[in-house]
Design a protein with these regions (language model features):
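Sec-dependent signal peptide recognition
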Residues: 2-11
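Extracytoplasmic c-type cytochrome modules immediately beyond a signal peptide or single-pass transmembrane anchor
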Residues: 20-141, 156-171
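Hydrophobic h-region of N-terminal signal peptides that target proteins for export
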Residues: 11-19
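The canonical Cys-X-X-Cys-His
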Residues: 142-152
Length: 171
């Protein structure tokens, strides 16, 4: 179960004001945003890993990951973020809707469904009676991610993780 939860890191959700008949259009936009964010984060971390090693990449990710996500949100005019049942950064703690969705993904994965086929989306009504479109999809972790999120982390890297993320639950 612990390995499964690590495999589901990170996850994304998007919100945008919509009408019910715009579901497929918003789904396509959401999937594209996820691809862009995943690609951008992966290439940035790989570059930092090559230039500065795992500790340098962790420090880079600590500073840049939220900025990359914010810039993508602004450029696409969507709210894009990452979350997980086991967050590293407390700014990424899931809300109730996300937590429920993540729990469903975990159960689906245990039942044998492939992560690449999982997603959930719906239009929800907020406390302000606004209707928003929400989309969440797990992103399987690649090899580079396991350097900091895997089970075989060096003592130096573990110390740096604890220093940068004192409330870390992602390891």
């Amino acid at each position: 179960m612990f390995l499964l939860l690590r495999f589901l890191l990170p996850l994304l959700f998007l919100t945008q004001l919509v009408c019910a008949d715009e579901m497929s259009s918003n789904k396509a936009k959401s999937i594209q945003a996820i691809k862009e964010l995943g690609s951008s984060l992966k290439s940035s971390v790989q570059m930092a890993m090559k230039e500065s090693g795992s500790i340098g990449a962790l420090e880079y990710c600590n500073v840049v990951a939220l900025d990359i996500t914010k810039k993508l949100s602004e450029s696409l005019k969507l709210t894009v973020s990452r979350t997980s049942l086991k967050t590293r950064n407390k700014k990424n703690i899931p809300d109730d809707w996300e937590q429920k969705s993540l729990s469903v993904f975990t159960a689906q994965h245990i039942a044998g469904e492939e992560i690449k086929n999982m997603y959930f989306h719906e239009i929800v009504t907020t406390n302000n009676n606004d209707r928003i479109y929400r989309f969440i999809k797990p992103i399987p972790m690649g090899k580079v991610c396991l350097t900091c999120h895997g089970s075989n982390i060096s003592a130096d890297l573990a110390h740096k993780i604890k220093e940068l993320y004192p409330d870390d639950k992602a390891v």
